[in-house]
């Protein structure tokens, strides 16, 4: 006779539980506050992902991996309907055009073309666009990626932290000329209070529950750009004979 206990399967009606302690009480107790990014409170910035600049990135095993992370992040924003702002710097010269996939994914979005100011947050036109988006949506969690982590990502991150934003740099959707640049930038941003994230983990944090209606739309970034979990999804889909499984947990009566 088997002594194996029966698995406990949570009800499919379960919803996400918030922390038991309020943010104010956690702060007063000296604890960290988990003020996480969500599709409802976030804005996503793509800074200077231009083909000329991307060609100089040296801290990835391949530029294909780097490009895949950037486009995976973009597809995540698209799937979850997170507002985005895209900026470029001197695109008419050596920096080159914005990555084609970004332009295709966000075909309805303008590109804010800076003409010399390196820190996008210090550019009056771009900051005006961001502040307008913040005021009209009441979103103050800024998810940020930049072509170079030491400049395009770090500089606006430090500026926005000073102005009271919650900033989440997506460090594997940023490149660097060297490992030293990446290490210095990561240390600098973390020390200033930024919450560093990665493309895959951020996508999971934003989705939060695979029972949410956005789950189907979130398949695209995982299948196309985040194979670490995309392979798992494909395996399930194939084993299910490529049709939806009505009762994957076997709990419906």
Indicate residue ranges for each PLM-predicted region.
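A general structural motif
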Residues: 116-124, 147-151
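Active-site acidic carboxylates
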Residues: 2-117, 132-137, 183-190, 207-208, ...
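Short linear, low-complexity motifs centered on an aromatic residue
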Residues: 199, 206-207
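A contiguous pocket-lining binding segment that forms or flanks enzyme active sites
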Residues: 140-199
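Active-site catalytic pocket residues across diverse enzymes, especially alpha/beta-hydrolases
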Residues: 106, 130, 160, 164
